[in-house]
């Protein structure tokens, strides 16, 4: 792969990680962990082992909104110069 392909892949990965909503990812993680806990409990109840089984329950706290400023558009990046033009 050329360096342009590598740079574009890194940029896409960064943008995906930057724009993915952390609250949405937490909700997905919570539902996935609850689903796996239900499956684990079913497996444990059918087994006859006498070892104490620890089931860690993840209790979500209040979701805090992180105040982030909106990302700049690419059109805003070449910022206009604040220096007055020189008159020759």
UniProtKB/Swiss-Prot annotation:
Annotated positions of the Sulfotyrosine modification: 77
UniProt signal peptide: 1-22
A GO cellular component entry from the record: endoplasmic reticulum
Tissues and organs where the protein is expressed, per its UniProt entry: Expressed in roots, shoots, leaves and flowers.
Modified residues (Hydroxyproline): 85
Key words of the record: Differentiation, Endoplasmic reticulum, Growth factor, Hydroxylation, Secreted, Signal, Sulfation
Location in or out of the cell: Endoplasmic reticulum
Residue ranges of the region described as Disordered: 44-88
Primary subcellular site in the record, as a coarse category: endoplasmic reticulum
Propeptide: 23-75
Single annotated GO MF: growth factor activity
Gene Ontology terms describing biological process: cell differentiation; lateral root development; positive regulation of cell population proliferation; regulation of asymmetric cell division; regulation of lateral root development; regulation of root meristem growth; regulation of root morphogenesis; root system development
Entry similarity comment: Belongs to the RGF family.
Additional detail: 'Golven' means irregular waves in Dutch.
Entry protein name: Protein GOLVEN 10
Organism ancestry: Eukaryota, Viridiplantae, Streptophyta, Embryophyta, Tracheophyta
Gene that specifies this protein: GLV10
